[in-house]
Amino acid sequence: MGYQHEKQNKDLWVSDEHGDTWLNTGDMARKDEEGYFWLTGRKKELIVRGGHNIEPKIIEEAMCKHEDISLAAAVGRPDLHAGEVPVCYVQSLNNKLDREDLLAFATAHIPEKAAIPKDIYILPELPVTVVGKVFKPELEKREINKKITKEIEAVLSNSQFTVEVVQNPMHGLLAEIQLHNCTSKAAETVDHRLGDYTLKYTVSQ
């Protein structure tokens, strides 16, 4: 059993702690109190920027018109004022791409002003599922991690901390922030700094 093409079967089957085998399709689901699993579909990809609902395909299709881009993925970056702003990750066919040139290209080719990415990241490869689809949660985790790290460093410049973004069954992507050798006051400072963001997080010491 599996996919027709053998290369798509790599890491397709996974086993849990009970020895049961599962098919890793990339879909999301929740388990109820009776042990039943409910498929909830794939993660909602719509980027909500203030009052604008942005369809990532608008960005991705425009960026893939560039002759040196083989793949593009648009995700939301947490933003204090707009909730989210769009950013775009692109897979390069060579090493000639320039960020500023791509931002200008995006401005010229994306018809919706609110959908123009605030930043563009050039990667040799984008994370993909076993069937070749871009695995956007990995990119969203990166954006959440970068935003939280930047905010904590702004208020606790000399403190040590770690940020891990995980998939939570209740909250979706959840940032778990661990402060090292910090006081409760420091934890309150971090919580106050992040409190106005729409992202989900926990702070522990």
What residue ranges belong to the model's regions?
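Conserved short beta-strand edge segments in small beta-sheet-based binding/regulatory domains
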Residues: 112-122, 158-160, 195-205
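Structured core of small recognition/catalytic domains
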Residues: 179-205
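AMP-binding/adenylate-forming catalytic core of the ANL superfamily
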Residues: 1-115, 124-132, 137-185, 189
